[in-house]
Amino acid sequence: MSSVERIKEYTDIPSESNGYISPPANWPQTGDVELKNLSLRYSPHSSKALDNVSFKVKAGTKVGIVGRTGAGKSSIIAAIYRLSDWENGTITIDNKDIKHIPLERLRNSISCIPQDPTLFDGTVRSNLDPFDRYSDVQIYGVLSKVGLIEECDELCLIFEQEQPNFSSHKLRNRFIDLNTVVKSGGSNLSQGQRQLLCLARSMLGARNIMLIDEATASIDYISDAKIQKTIRETMKNTTILTIAHRLRSVIDYDKILVMEMGRVKEYDHPYTLISDRNTIFYRLCRQSGEFENLFELAKVSFDNKR
């Protein structure tokens, strides 16, 4: 009886609304993102998770989203990825309303690294490249960039390319090889390794927009710094929205979006915000215990971009 009730429960779940306009094959070509007067709530009688949110992100811009728990940070990611429908407002990517884009097309066009990465029962290779589109060299390349294998010089990768029987353990990676077993949910990996694998998978796709929801929260500072360096150096033209607990992770981004109670409170360069004692961001940096370091990093970033 319980099984029948559960089946009935599943059949009654409303389908996700789907779009009907197929964009060009190269969409999104640039990666401009705009939210305009967006309001979202998760149930009819709940308070708004997002309340009249508006901001623009130019193509290639790196935006750090910060705020206290429940401020609406993750709801922004959920809305852009259309995991939740909104009650009013619009989201456009390259001037196209994403509500009109078929869901599969939309989600295949955006890289998303969630708080809890999804990994499948299989191997490292099948998790990174489920459709067998990439060579071992390309896969090893992204594993190296995110720090899951030790730094390997170019000759090593050329060896792999030219000699199919080249022993992959010579790469001295944390995995035995690409056929290393990954259990369902990545239960045989640490939280940090799961997030790093998810980042590597996203990098293989080479999409113009990447959404990162607290992806480095469980990773040590050294690994976090390597990831952020990789993002900046290899994704210069990618539009990135990152939710981060560690202000250091986003202090040298192009913009900081400060959320509070579902509303946008501040949106500017980190140095501009941290220099103003009246901003919420200034207070968050003070409370972090590393204000002086954050201030200096923000200033260097600001000066370099002038």
From Swiss-Prot:
InterPro entries, per database record: AAA+_ATPase, ABC_transporter-like_ATP-bd, ABC_transporter-like_CS, ABC_transporter_C-like, P-loop_NTPase
A single BP term in Gene Ontology: transmembrane transport
Transmembrane helix as UniProt keyword: no
Record key words, sorted: ATP-binding, Nucleotide-binding, Repeat
Domain ABC transporter: 33-286
Residues that bind ATP: G67, R68, T69, G70, A71, G72, K73, S74
One Pfam family it belongs to: ABC_tran
Gene Ontology molecular-function annotations: ATP binding; ATP hydrolysis activity
A GO CC term assigned to this protein in UniProt: membrane
Listed SMART domains: AAA
Family stated for the protein in its record: Belongs to the ABC transporter superfamily. ABCC family. Conjugate transporter (TC 3.A.1.208) subfamily.
Full protein name: Putative uncharacterized protein YKR104W
